[in-house]
């Protein structure tokens, strides 16, 4: 007699593992992956600074290999858009990025149009993947809103090296995969890490500490004292606005409501459809991804099965 359900076929522990795999959402921080593979591409092949074909190979190789590794039921590829809402809160937000780009060996004036076009080509060819962005939102915002509002009961794996996303690990159904070190991120106390970052600031995003010259050690002391007691202490009232500013900039719980609603609507209305082999082949051919085209039969069924 053929056994017809999980209860008859597998142990309780195995059933749980299977159900988790069937409800696993893989969420890529698209810009994080793009820049990580871009600098690797230029380092390994400095001549790839005009058409960026080697970068395209590294990007897609990382993307597809990670999908195969985690075998998800759904894939989200989230990207930033220009003019983040955070600039209205703090005009110096990420002001250090342009300086870094100007010093970089990458020709960003040539890269950005290629990147924008490449994103649209992925969206067109890989029609079972949610390629998401929303005006004035960063990829972090898209990831955070979906994890908090749409993926509360699924097993979510966030693919990024960005430590800002550690706060999402407060919820036990969220994991973060570090593609550089090829391992799941270990974060013992994500809530405390978030509180420390709000107090000490984030140099990578040009967000200053709430009090000048306050690093992690100083932030630890403030937390031990109690943030409310610290801010109410005589002479410290001036730091309250800085604290409130940093909370809004860093804590995903302060993403504007209208932005969150827009992200959710964009996800819910996204036109997922069956993959057309001709579009996939055209994508691989146009972007000189010959080896991937040859291997499509190996990983293609998994990509086609996404929903």
Region spans (language model):
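AAA+ P-loop ATPase catalytic core
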Residues: 159
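Non-catalytic nucleic-acid-binding/docking modules located in mid-to-C-terminal regions
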Residues: 2-10, 18-22, 69-79, 94-106, ...
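Noncatalytic, basic helical substrate-engagement surface that gates or grips nucleic-acid strands
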Residues: 2-12, 17-156, 165, 170-184, ...
């Amino acid at each position: 007699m053929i056994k017809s359900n999980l209860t008859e076929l597998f142990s309780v522990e195995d059933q749980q593992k299977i159900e988790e795999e069937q409800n696993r959402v893989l969420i890529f921080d698209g810009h994080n992956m793009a820049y990580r593979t871009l600098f690797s591409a230029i380092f390994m092949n400095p001549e790839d600074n005009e058409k960026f074909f080697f970068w395209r190979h590294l990007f897609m190789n990382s993307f597809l290999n990670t999908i195969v590794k985690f075998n998800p039921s759904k894939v989200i590829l989230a990207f930033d858009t220009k003019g983040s809402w955070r600039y209205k809160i703090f005009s110096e937000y990420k002001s250090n990025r342009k300086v870094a780009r100007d010093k970089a060996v990458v020709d960003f004036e040539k890269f950005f149009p290629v990147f924008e076009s490449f994103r649209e080509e992925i969206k067109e060819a890989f029609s079972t993947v949610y390629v998401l962005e929303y005006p004035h939102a960063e990829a972090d915002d898209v990831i955070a809103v979906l994890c908090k509002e749409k993926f509360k009961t699924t097993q979510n794996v966030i693919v990024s090296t960005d430590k800002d996303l550690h706060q999402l690990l407060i919820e036990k159904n969220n994991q973060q995969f570090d593609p550089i070190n090829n391992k799941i991120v270990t974060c013992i106390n994500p809530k405390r890490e978030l509180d420390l970052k709000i107090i000490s600031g984030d140099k990578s995003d040009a967000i200053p500490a709430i009090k000048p010259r306050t690093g992690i050690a100083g932030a630890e002391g403030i937390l031990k004292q109690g943030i409310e007691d610290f801010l109410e202490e005589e002479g410290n009232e001036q730091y309250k606005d800085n604290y409130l500013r940093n909370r809004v900039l860093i804590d995903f719980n302060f993403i504007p409501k209208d932005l969150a609603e827009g992200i959710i609507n964009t996800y819910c209305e996204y036109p997922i459809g069956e993959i057309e082999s001709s579009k996939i082949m055209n994508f691989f051919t146009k972007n000189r991804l010959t080896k991937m085209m040859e291997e499509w039969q190996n990983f293609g069924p998994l990509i086609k099965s996404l929903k």
